[in-house]
């Protein structure tokens, strides 16, 4: 409970859309920047966040909810602390807004524990000086774009290419294989997408290990700008107090920047390049620096990134890129082939794909896979015009192996079992590297290409080939 003596009071002085000026003419103590204030409306309570001081007694605030019905001289309460949100095991399986209020219609949460959404990143001496690979159990990711524990991954993909299913599978694997937790931040999300995700997680059986936090597209920019911090605060508690490995999803990180730009314009700040806020790099840095590992736990972040007009030099995505450790690109052309996850193995990259980190064996296999797929892509035009028979014997072998590799990069997901009818597979990193190594060495050139579709390890592909041969023999 907040003690009454800690509260101070002011009055609404001016309302300009989501910007509210509050005057504290009778109070000696003014709110500090980031302090939380509230106004009691007829049917609800409106929360504000102090952003700057104007003159001797006026505080300019950003509303975290709709300001309709707000009038001058209405009483404003200053809580003398930043926004605090619930944390701990009680938040698992629940859905929240930016203020940490449940929006899933279930029972209210206990009043404690709570934490401020404005926190410092882990101290340098608390962070480990080693680089650990975060094993996802998804072959194409672990082999070609390995994730770093406590790192930041950019997820690029349009609608309908399997982004949500990939996110759900990552949540499933960290929960089942690593006993970890996941926090999902919907920043500027469409309400429909958030609703679909919630029910899909219930059906996929991963909701009990997940927290959902939404600042929807129809909400004021103040709410959309702070919702990522709300989710991050919940993830930090699991990392610091429960020593957990946490997966943090932010969809979409561009909306975080966009909301900051709107707030900056409303506050009258001079715009910077392409109309973005002058504080873009600082705001992004404050968020990204808090996503880190400590010696007892970690937060690994997967951030969906929208690129305006496909311009990678736009300040919003360009500022995000500087913080990323890996880039995962979902490709519609690969999805059209029926290969899921539809990750482009040539456009996706990771700074961890280095022999000093992953080991020389893993590095050589990954490089070999990329080289064959690159050569296969170069030969596509020749095959389309002249046909495969016009290729040299060496190129024919490359094409056949590339097709097997391309098919083998597909994988049945646990969360997709209900509509695919294929049991999900978690493939260890060692099995992944060994399987692709055998394909590169030509040990399985005699197997049909169909045997490599939607299997886990290479042993499963061999067994599937035997079944296919038996079925073929029966049809004779």
Swiss-Prot record:
<dbReference type="GO" id="GO:0005886">
    <property type="term" value="C:plasma membrane"/>
</dbReference>
<dbReference type="Pfam" id="PF00006">
    <property type="entry name" value="ATP-synt_ab"/>
</dbReference>
<comment type="function">
    <text>Produces ATP from ADP in the presence of a proton gradient across the membrane. The catalytic sites are hosted primarily by the beta subunits.</text>
</comment>
<dbReference type="InterPro" id="IPR003593">
    <property type="entry name" value="AAA+_ATPase"/>
</dbReference>
<keyword id="KW-1278">Translocase</keyword>
<feature type="binding site">
    <location>
        <begin position="157"/>
        <end position="164"/>
    </location>
    <ligand>
        <name>ATP</name>
    </ligand>
</feature>
<comment type="similarity">
    <text>Belongs to the ATPase alpha/beta chains family.</text>
</comment>
<dbReference type="Pfam" id="PF22919">
    <property type="entry name" value="ATP-synt_VA_C"/>
</dbReference>
<dbReference type="GO" id="GO:0016887">
    <property type="term" value="F:ATP hydrolysis activity"/>
</dbReference>
<dbReference type="GO" id="GO:0045259">
    <property type="term" value="C:proton-transporting ATP synthase complex"/>
</dbReference>
<keyword id="KW-0066">ATP synthesis</keyword>
<dbReference type="InterPro" id="IPR036121">
    <property type="entry name" value="ATPase_F1/V1/A1_a/bsu_N_sf"/>
</dbReference>
<keyword id="KW-0813">Transport</keyword>
<dbReference type="InterPro" id="IPR055190">
    <property type="entry name" value="ATP-synt_VA_C"/>
</dbReference>
<keyword id="KW-0067">ATP-binding</keyword>
<dbReference type="InterPro" id="IPR024034">
    <property type="entry name" value="ATPase_F1/V1_b/a_C"/>
</dbReference>
<protein>
    <recommendedName>
        <fullName>ATP synthase subunit beta</fullName>
        <ecNumber>7.1.2.2</ecNumber>
    </recommendedName>
</protein>
<dbReference type="InterPro" id="IPR050053">
    <property type="entry name" value="ATPase_alpha/beta_chains"/>
</dbReference>
<keyword id="KW-1003">Cell membrane</keyword>
<keyword id="KW-0375">Hydrogen ion transport</keyword>
<dbReference type="GO" id="GO:0005524">
    <property type="term" value="F:ATP binding"/>
</dbReference>
<dbReference type="InterPro" id="IPR000194">
    <property type="entry name" value="ATPase_F1/V1/A1_a/bsu_nucl-bd"/>
</dbReference>
<comment type="subunit">
    <text>F-type ATPases have 2 components, CF(1) - the catalytic core - and CF(0) - the membrane proton channel. CF(1) has five subunits: alpha(3), beta(3), gamma(1), delta(1), epsilon(1). CF(0) has three main subunits: a(1), b(2) and c(9-12). The alpha and beta chains form an alternating ring which encloses part of the gamma chain. CF(1) is attached to CF(0) by a central stalk formed by the gamma and epsilon chains, while a peripheral stalk is formed by the delta and b chains.</text>
</comment>
<dbReference type="InterPro" id="IPR027417">
    <property type="entry name" value="P-loop_NTPase"/>
</dbReference>
<keyword id="KW-0472">Membrane</keyword>
<dbReference type="Pfam" id="PF02874">
    <property type="entry name" value="ATP-synt_ab_N"/>
</dbReference>
<keyword id="KW-0547">Nucleotide-binding</keyword>
<dbReference type="InterPro" id="IPR005722">
    <property type="entry name" value="ATP_synth_F1_bsu"/>
</dbReference>
<dbReference type="GO" id="GO:0046933">
    <property type="term" value="F:proton-transporting ATP synthase activity, rotational mechanism"/>
</dbReference>
<keyword id="KW-0406">Ion transport</keyword>
<dbReference type="InterPro" id="IPR004100">
    <property type="entry name" value="ATPase_F1/V1/A1_a/bsu_N"/>
</dbReference>
<dbReference type="InterPro" id="IPR020003">
    <property type="entry name" value="ATPase_a/bsu_AS"/>
</dbReference>
<keyword id="KW-0139">CF(1)</keyword>
